[in-house]
Regions:
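Amphipathic alpha-helical dimerization/coiled-coil segments
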Residues: 91-120
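Recognition helices and adjacent regulatory flanks at domain boundaries
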Residues: 1-11, 19-23, 45, 57, ...
Length: 120
């Protein structure tokens, strides 16, 4: 069952988790940050995510203003996803998670992520 919070009464951390705390959401944002912008690329980069779950996460991220969808083909409809200003700002959270993970849980082996974190 999905969590629901009264965001008016909760701390900022709880409100943030209400948006990005579902399984896979942060990883989808990570991969869009790394340049995986098409649905098929995201499906491959998030190994193990189901198609319906990826669609759900992208839809929610779009509704919450983290990503925008741009169609590059009408027939069949094909879209790319890009971070909005709000999504770009979330990179700071990704960097903090990356730093914490490498400090406390071992060395980084993901070069593209390390390069992304050096930017901005």
């Amino acid at each position: 069952m999905a969590r629901t919070y009264d965001s008016q009464e909760l701390c900022p951390i709880a409100r943030t988790l209400d948006i990005v705390g579902d399984r896979w959401t942060v990883l989808v944002l990570r991969d869009i940050s790394l340049g995986y912008t098409r649905y098929s690329e995201l499906l491959e980069s998030c190994a193990g995510i189901s198609t319906n779950l990826l669609s759900d996460r992208l839809k929610k991220l779009e509704q919450r203003g983290f990503v925008e969808r741009f169609f590059y083909s009408d027939h069949p409809p094909r879209a790319e996803y890009r971070l909005t200003e709000k999504g770009e700002d979330f990179r700071r959270v990704l960097r903090a998670m990356y730093t914490w993970g490498t400090t406390h849980e071992g060395r980084n082996t993901d070069r593209p992520l390390a390069e992304m974190l050096k930017r901005r």
